[in-house]
Amino acid sequence: MYRFIIFFSLLALTASKVSEPEKDDEIAVKIPTKRSVSEPPKDDDIAVKIPMRKKRGIAIHPWQWESHLWPNAEVPYDIASHYTATERGIILSAMEAFRDVTCVRFRPRRSTDKHYLQINKHYQLERCFSYIGRQSSRWLFGTRDGKVETRMKLDPSCLLYNGRGTVMHELMHILGFYHEHQRDDRDRRIGGSASHYNFKIYQRAKSYYMGGYDANSIMHYNFGSVPWQKRDYFSPSDIRNINTLYKCNNRVVSKFPSTIPSTSTTTTKAPQFELFEKKQIESNSLFRRRRS
């Protein structure tokens, strides 16, 4: 009898550790040391390990591609109805940034989509977080209708200042990328606690380093010892990394510049969006980029 009690206690403890990302203002997900279907990759930022020519960035392991990359570079999403029109507009603006320079497409989910991104502010986690890559565990992320949702929490406070950049950062996590400042060749001025999961270094044996360190990446935190930057646009290496990870070279990609800061979205009221359609994006100044 006691053996059964101990067994189920350990099982419950293990489940709570697997399904609950570590706390932080951006996200949490550790890379599992062993291949496990039930254990989602977790951490604040990084990408997948890719056997290709030298690129910049850091990514997840090749064995995770099949289950954690989004097929055909297409991410179905569902944005909770509790967000205001302005908040929803900021989220959609961040999604549109990927369309400009990569083959990745975010679209409203359909009833036939088995996997999709769910954005909600009520998850029992800190402010803003995202899982790394598409989640596939029905045990942890299954819904009542048999679907599997990859969760992103966006508290409204995350959207107040540099909201567009914050959402772009979190969407990079959703695509499979980790933090740039957690590389072993990062700026030596970066300081912090080694016990903090968003400061620790990811070993090259457990993650894929896509070329050299890039302090301008949208996946890089701002630190007091390093010149502060407001990031609401992709660096050239961010663009290369996404296109490499999702094999965009053989697809048509827009040539709009992404290294120029976009128009602020924090003071502009967005219209109510029923569908994420290109014609709506092009007709609304909230989503326009400066192209000169």
UniProtKB/Swiss-Prot annotation:
Main location: secreted
Keywords, in A-Z order: Disulfide bond, Hydrolase, Metal-binding, Metalloprotease, Protease, Secreted, Signal, Zinc, Zymogen
Transmembrane segments: none
Cofactor, free-text remark: Binds 1 zinc ion per subunit.
GO MF annotations, alphabetized: metalloendopeptidase activity; zinc ion binding
Disulfide-bond pairs as recorded: C103-C248, C128-C158
Top-level taxon of origin: Eukaryota
Keyword Hydrolase attached: yes
GO cellular component, one term: extracellular region
The protein's name in its UniProt record: Zinc metalloproteinase nas-3
Organism encoding this protein: Caenorhabditis elegans
